Structures are given as C-alpha cells and as structure tokens.
C-alpha cells in the first residue's frame, strides 16, 4: 500500500488516467521486472495510477512507484465465469502485496465467494474497493454495498459479440446515480479516454493500447497489410 490515505488516493486518481500494465500471458514481456518497468514508464508519462494483475507483479511494482495501485488476481475457474479476484485469499494477498484499491468481479454470476464477503474483507484489510461490473444494476448493487469505485470493466464481456466502442451510456448512468465511475473497456485512443472524463467518469483505465505491445504492433501491421 502507498503512504496515501483513502481520501488522498481518491483525489490523486480523480479525472486521471490509470495505466493497466498487464502483458500478454506467457508472452516475452510477462515478468514482474518488465511489468514494474512498464509501470514506471507509465507514471513518467503522466499516469495518475496503475492497475496491476498478479501478486508478484504487484510486489515488484509497489517497490518502484508511489502512485495508487489497483490490484487484481485473474483466475480461470472450472465452475464459474468469474475471473477477477474471486477468492478471499486473493483479497488478502493483494492487500499484503501493497494494493491501495482492490478490484473484483462485481457481476451477478455464479461465483465461489459472494460479493458481500469480498467487499467486507477488502474493507477489513484497509483497502478501497472497486467493482468491475457489466451493467447498471450490478454497479448500483455494489455501490449500495459501500464499494468506492464502480468500473464499467465487464460491459461487453459477459457473453455475445464484444462491441467495438466503449459503453458510454453505462458511464453516464452510473455517474448520474452518484457513483465514482472508472471508465474501462475499449478506451483505446486518447480521444476516447478524453470523452470518458467529459461524460462523467471519475477516472479512465487504458490497458492494451498502452502496454500490450503485441496488440499494438498487430494493429499497425494489419493496417499496413490491408493497403495492398
């Protein structure tokens, strides 16, 4: 955890960019040292905070930056579609590794641990909570349980075709209902990130367009190939 108080953490990320430093799994950049370097470079570039996946990545990053960190653990479970910080053990390890904010899957789906239990443990450990939600109802459910930040993270990722554009309406609706909204999901250009803040987001998270080099290069390579 940084040395910032909860109000200071929230103030620091307000209207700011969160850089999600999550390399492609098992790719050449998938190591704690490289994730920490990505994080440092992101902060130099102006990121107000970071989103880091994995305990070892979080530990390495916490050692080299002082900005707020949103910590998550991703898992692939045989009996649940929920991937983001699904167990109380995940919450405990993220807190111990230095997360200021712990994000969890806030969707209304089959899960190994209730949202209530996850939120309770986050608060017991002195961290802020962020719920990664897919729709307005889920966001309000978590908001009413005391979650400080509601993310649009899962919108478009719980079934069916993934939309090309971000879910602006969800950001607008949650903001209008009194939530601190983390706009996240398909904000892959500076203009889209700017729009998120303009329509009411508290902060905006950008991931692949900043830190997944394989994806970024493929966008350019595909565009160049299509020219002939």
From Swiss-Prot:
Keyword vocabulary terms for this entry: Carbohydrate metabolism, Isomerase
Superkingdom of the source species: Bacteria
A Pfam family hit: NanE
Entry's Gene Ontology cellular component terms: cytosol
Gene3D superfamilies associated with the record: Aldolase class I
Metabolic or biological pathway, per its Swiss-Prot or TrEMBL entry: Amino-sugar metabolism; N-acetylneuraminate degradation; D-fructose 6-phosphate from N-acetylneuraminate: step 3/5
Molecular function GO labels: N-acylglucosamine-6-phosphate 2-epimerase activity
Keyword Isomerase belongs to the record: yes
One Gene Ontology term from the biological process aspect of the record: N-acetylmannosamine catabolic process
Keyword Amino-acid biosynthesis: no
Catalytic activity: an N-acyl-D-glucosamine 6-phosphate = an N-acyl-D-mannosamine 6-phosphate
CDD domains cross-referenced by the UniProt entry: NanE (cd04729)
InterPro entries in UniProt: Aldolase_TIM, NanE, RibuloseP-bd_barrel
EC number of this enzyme: 5.1.3.9
General function of this protein: Converts N-acetylmannosamine-6-phosphate (ManNAc-6-P) to N-acetylglucosamine-6-phosphate (GlcNAc-6-P).
Recorded family membership: Belongs to the NanE family.
Xref: NCBIfam families: PRK01130.1
Record's protein name: Putative N-acetylmannosamine-6-phosphate 2-epimerase
Organism: Pasteurella multocida (strain Pm70)
């Amino acid at each position: 955890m940084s040395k910032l108080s909860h109000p200071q953490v929230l103030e620091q990320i307000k209207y700011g960019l969160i850089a999600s430093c999550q390399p492609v799994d098992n790719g050449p950049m998938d190591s704690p040292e490289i994730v920490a370097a990505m994080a440092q470079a992101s902060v130099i570039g102006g990121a107000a905070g970071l989103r880091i996946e994995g305990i070892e990545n979080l530990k390495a990053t916490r050692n080299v930056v002082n900005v707020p960190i949103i910590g998550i653990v991703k898992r692939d479970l045989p009996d649940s579609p929920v991937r983001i910080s699904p167990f109380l053990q995940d919450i405990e390890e993220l807190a111990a590794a230095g997360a200021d904010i712990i994000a969890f899957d806030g969707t209304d789906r089959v899960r190994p641990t209730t949202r209530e239990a996850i939120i309770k443990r986050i608060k017991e450990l002195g961290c802020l909570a962020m719920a990664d939600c897919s729709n307005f109802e889920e966001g309000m459910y978590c908001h009413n349980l005391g979650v400080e930040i509601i993310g649009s993270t899962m919108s478009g990722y719980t079934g069916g075709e993934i939309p090309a554009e971000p879910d602006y309406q969800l950001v607008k609706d949650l903001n209008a209902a009194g939530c601190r909204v983390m706009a996240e999901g398909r904000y892959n250009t500076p203009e889209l990130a700017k729009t998120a803040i303009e329509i009411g987001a508290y902060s905006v998270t950008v991931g692949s367009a900043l830190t997944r080099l394989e994806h970024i290069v493929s966008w350019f390579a595909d565009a160049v190939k299509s020219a002939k």
